[in-house]
């Protein structure tokens, strides 16, 4: 009996330790999370879409490690996408994701993509305080900017995204 209790305690500690570690490694494991807060800026080429930008940002991590931060404005989607394996530390405890694509869509479906160079800089939204997610990218023809400040509340796991 004592061995079983120890095994359960060890398993529980391991399980909770892994969950906490995943939170510390935002954007983390494959899936979709929603971050509440305020969209501070969203610009596509010369069009300023900030006024219609929603107070929710999606972070999508695919099984292959691709990470996309998706802004929504007036039913349209703008995603800043890069290889999560390329995330490096940045200043002030933030991290930096190099970008390779900007994706576009309507409703819940991404329908277009543009090759870009740029990056997203972000803090850990699980830290319990507001943090910024700021993305800038340039293609041959356009520039894209998205800036979002989280509320400080923990992100919410959504269905799908795998």
Kindly give the residue locations of the regions a language model identified.
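Bacterial N-terminal signal peptides
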Residues: 7-15
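An ectodomain-focused feature that recognizes extracytoplasmic/extracellular
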Residues: 22-96
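Acidic, glycine-rich flexible loop segments
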Residues: 94-148
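Generic "edge-of-domain/loop-turn" microfeature
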Residues: 76, 87, 106, 127, ...
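Sec/Tat signal peptide C-region and signal peptidase I cleavage site
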Residues: 16-22
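Positively charged n-region of N-terminal signal peptides that target proteins for export
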Residues: 1-5
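Edge beta-strand at a domain terminus
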Residues: 26-27, 81-85, 132, 136-162
